[in-house]
Amino acid sequence: MKPTPKRDRADSAKAAVTAIQSAALGPIAPPKFVTVRKQDRPLWNAIVMARPRDTWNDADLILASHLARAYGDMAHLEAHIDRNGMVVDEKINPACALLDKATRRALALARQLKVDAVSTVGKSRDIRNGSELE
């Protein structure tokens, strides 16, 4: 097994320079073997910018494309529900079940990719404690 190179401390000058250089490069482009729909590209950009550039590997980028698509599908389903309502012909709109499944899939993918709120911001008790300081 190939050892993973040790990362620089987040509070080091080298890490700060790397972060600035990575931010200047903008979002990572999808690899050739990954398809990201045009309408999902802003979602892709937000996802890949949520983690340091040097932490992404090809397997993660594949999952990131699935997450961007799930977010795009969720927006489409929400618009459909807004247009047609939660109830259609006295039954629950089938789009509601699809939206629920897409949301669950997106949450699982976000956790797996470590781009969820707990991974990027911290636990809610820590956020609450930090906001009390402001």
Q: Where do the model's predicted regions map?
A:
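Non-transmembrane, interaction-prone segments in cytosolic or luminal domains
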Residues: 27, 34-43, 58-60, 89, ...
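An amphipathic, hydrophobic-aromatic interaction surface with interspersed Lys/Arg
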Residues: 30-84
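Amphipathic alpha-helical protein-protein interaction segments
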Residues: 65-128, 132-134
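Arg/Lys-rich, low-complexity, intrinsically disordered N-terminal tails that contact nucleic acids
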Residues: 1-45, 119-134
